Amino acid sequence: MPVPALCLLWALAMVTRPASAAPMGGPELAQHEELTLLFHGTLQLGQALNGVYRTTEGRLTKARNSLGLYGRTIELLGQEVSRGRDAAQELRASLLETQMEEDILQLQAEATAEVLGEVAQAQKVLRDSVQRLEVQLRSAWLGPAYREFEVLKAHADKQSHILWALTGHVQRQRREMVAQQHRLRQIQERLHTAALPA
């Protein structure tokens, strides 16, 4: 109960006292003492209620502050989760791009290997022709066979050079594929790490 109301109650109790200067009798004195005790009891009850109110208000303030901190923590965690999702999405996009590049390199390597096979077959045919001409030249060193031999020999040298260049190209592609696979593994590891719970 608020203190002003208690004061008003005390004033009313004083008004109810007899205005005469004569001493109070037994019943009047008892009634006055009862009113005094009632006032003091009401005052103590009001003070106790006021203390309970202030304590409760303090607890509510602490609870509001705790809820505010909890809400802020939830908000920060939500931001972290959002950033983690964005990072995982970027890693997936990078992984897809790397896989596409690896597929392209694989197709190029297969096409180059096919060309190398054809060149190797052509070179074998050419070597066989050169060997046949060498046999013919043993019997006739001069003449059209010799000129044909020189042409075929030059062609064989050219084919050997092309084969050598293609072999180097295949080796470079293999090195690129190895590097690409290493990069792909790194991205997969990062993606797996990003997906793990904190």
Swiss-Prot record:
Induction: In response to food intake. Stimulated by insulin. The keyword Ribonucleoprotein does not apply. It is found in: Secreted. Proteolytically cleaved at the N-terminus. One of its GO terms (molecular function) is hormone activity. Residues 1-21 form the signal peptide. It comes from the Eukaryota. GO terms for biological process: cell maturation; fat cell differentiation; lipid metabolic process; positive regulation of protein processing; regulation of lipid metabolic process; regulation of lipoprotein metabolic process; triglyceride homeostasis. The keyword Signal applies. GO terms for cellular component: extracellular region. Predominantly expressed in liver. Also expressed in adipose tissues. Keywords: Diabetes mellitus, Hormone, Lipid metabolism, Secreted, Signal. Hormone that acts as a blood lipid regulator by regulating serum triglyceride levels. May be involved in the metabolic transition between fasting and refeeding: required to direct fatty acids to adipose tissue for storage in the fed state. It is linked to Type 1 diabetes mellitus: A multifactorial disorder of glucose homeostasis that is characterized by susceptibility to ketoacidosis in the absence of insulin therapy. Clinical features are polydipsia, polyphagia and polyuria which result from hyperglycemia-induced osmotic diuresis and secondary thirst. These derangements result in long-term complications that affect the eyes, kidneys, nerves, and blood vessels. Type 2 diabetes mellitus: A multifactorial disorder of glucose homeostasis caused by a lack of sensitivity to insulin. Affected individuals usually have an obese body habitus and manifestations of a metabolic syndrome characterized by diabetes, insulin resistance, hypertension and hypertriglyceridemia. The disease results in long-term complications that affect the eyes, kidneys, nerves, and blood vessels. Interacts with ANGPTL3. Belongs to the ANGPTL8 family. This is Angiopoietin-like protein 8. It comes from Homo sapiens (Human).
